[in-house]
Each structure stands twice: as C-alpha cells, then as structure tokens.
Amino acid sequence: MHGQKNISERYQKFKEMEGTGKIVCVTGGAGYLASWLIMRLLERGYSVRTTVRSDPKFREDVSHLKALPEATEKLQIFEADLENPESFDDAINGCVGVFLVAQGMNFAEEYTLEKIIKTCVEGTLRILQSCLKSKTVKKVVYTSSADAAMMISNLKAVKEIDETIWSEVDNFISKPEQVIPGLPSYVVSKVLTERACLKFSEEHGLDVVTILPPLVVGPFITPHPPPSVSIALSIISGDVSMMLGVRLENAVHIDDVALAHIFVFECEKAKGRHICSSVDFPMHDLPKFISENYPEFNVPTDLLKDIEEQEPVHLSSDKLLSMGFQFKYDFAEIFGDAIRCAKEKGFL
C-alpha cells in the first residue's frame, strides 16, 4: 500500500511549478477533498486562498491546513458562508481561478426545495457573480457529484452513465415548501446547482466546468475520517447500515479526483461536465478484499449476503481520459490507502 510519502513521490513531474505566481481560491477548505486539493495546489506552486464557515456553531478545525508545507507563505484562510455569498468577495478578488468545493448541505438532514435554492443555487450563483466582478477569475471548477447523473428510473437497464445523463429530480421540485429527505435533497442540490453554473457560464461568458466524482476514498489529512471514508470502512465494524443508502459500486481515489480538478482547470479543452470515476466494482467485492488482505479485522467474506448481488453500472470517464488525464490508483489502492491511513491515525 502507498503511504502519503509514496503518493507524493509519484508526482515529481506534476510538481513543475505550473501555478507559480498564480492565486486560486478553494471553498470549503477544511473538508476532505478541498484540503487534499489545497495540498496539491500548493505543491504545484499556486498560492491558495481558502474559505471556511463563519458560523460559530460550525467552527471548523483548520490545523491540518496550517500544517501543510508552504502554508505559512502561500495559504490564506478566510471566513465565508454560502448563506452570505458576499463574504466570498475578499477571498476571490485577485484570483485567476476558483474551485467551488464547499457543500452547503448536511447529508443527513431534510431540506425544502426553497432552502436548497436559496442556499445552494442562489448562493453559488452570487459567488459566480463575485468571480465576474473580480475581473481576474479566468475559470471556475464546480464540484458536483456522480449522483447528479445516476438517479434515474431505468438505472438497472442502463449499462453506462456519461455526461449527457442527468438525474431525474422533477418529482422533488414541484412544490417549494416540499420537504425532501437526506439523499434526494443532496441530489437535487447538486443537479440544480450544476445546471445553474453551466447556464451562468453560457449567459455571462465565464468559463465554468464541473467535476462529477462518485464515492471518494483514500488517505486523508483531516483530523477525523471523512464521511465517505467512514462509509467505505464501516464494513470493518460489521455495521453495513451506512452502506445501504449509498451506491457503493463506483469509486475514485482522493488523489486522482483532486488532480482531476487541477487538470480541468489548466486544460483549455475542458468544457462542461466531467465524470471522474476510476473503478466500478460489485459491492460484495469489498468485504472479500478486506478479508483477504486484512485478516486481522475478521471481516466475513459473506457479510453482505443479504444484499442482492448485481453488476455495477459503468460510470464513464471517457471524456476526461480523452483529454489526456490518467488515473493512478486501482481498487486495491483506493481502499487499501484508506485503511492504512485510518490505522496510522488510530481510527482502526
């Protein structure tokens, strides 16, 4: 398995200071993907401004960001919140690029359509207005989700999902006051916000591209295991309840998806949506993998025997690959790196 040092060694060519002298903004910097993305941007020579939530109720630990090499010289941390989009102005002004990674919703909560539109859609659009107003931002990368393409009624009959497919959310958006449960509300927020971003791009001439990752797994620099890693590793404790509401059949390594964000930002050919998924696997392969490679956890190979086994739907990253991007990590590394990191940090 690859430790963080070995992961970094893979990218000597990557670290050619492409971003030297350039300033970019990453929203939601305390999170899993954003913190890893910040680490890679700093390595590439960029100066980074990142935002964390300003609400005292959601005070975020940023010690892992401050501990990054070159953070003292090249990382600035701003307080901002999607419910107050103007608070992003100072962080964005002077940047050449913005990575909209912050997630304005709690996966476990319920939301009305009105709340989703006000916080996620309108908040994001006002941030895009800030990008226009800055006169310096050349490109914006919005982190959507594969869920914005995979929630369709005939999914079992579909062999492949690509960027032309959008999740079907009409049933959830007929009434503004309608309460939408956790996972569907997340999907609705991603679909509506991504569509709004791309429409804004067309109408205002601001270059906006989107990334659609599935479950993101791998090592982490956050103080605690991220939700996606916790879901993937919950199988070790025998608690499969966390897995049942998640499509655990497509995944991508945290390093690959972070580098894909940088790739589409730097690639002039990148336009529109980009699915970023490296492996499709039957859910039942995960307990088998852990049982065979980590026998100390005593995970039964038939742990998911009560869940119907079926072939995964292929989540196609052909568009991203056709532009020259390459995935570096396979199934064993995606989950093996997560286990190794969790063990090293004392969570397993």
From Swiss-Prot:
Transmembrane segments: none
EC number(s) given by UniProt: 1.1.1.415
CDD domains, sorted: FR_SDR_e (cd08958)
InterPro entries per UniProt: Epimerase_deHydtase, NAD(P)-bd_dom_sf, NAD(P)_dehydrat-like
Catalytic reaction annotation: narcotine hemiacetal + NAD(+) = noscapine + NADH + H(+)
BP terms from Gene Ontology: alkaloid metabolic process
Pathway info: Alkaloid biosynthesis
Lineage top rank: taxon: Eukaryota
GO-annotated molecular function: oxidoreductase activity, acting on the CH-OH group of donors, NAD or NADP as acceptor
Keywords from the named record: Alkaloid metabolism, NAD, Oxidoreductase
Protein family according to the UniProt entry: Belongs to the NAD(P)-dependent epimerase/dehydratase family.
Chain's role: Oxidoreductase that catalyzes the last step in the biosynthesis of the benzylisoquinoline alkaloid noscapine. Converts narcotine hemiacetal to noscapine.
PANTHER family reported in the protein's UniProt record: CINNAMOYL-COA REDUCTASE 16, NAD DEPENDENT EPIMERASE/DEHYDRATASE
Protein's name in the database: Noscapine synthase SDR1
Organism, as annotated: Papaver somniferum
Underlying gene: SDR1
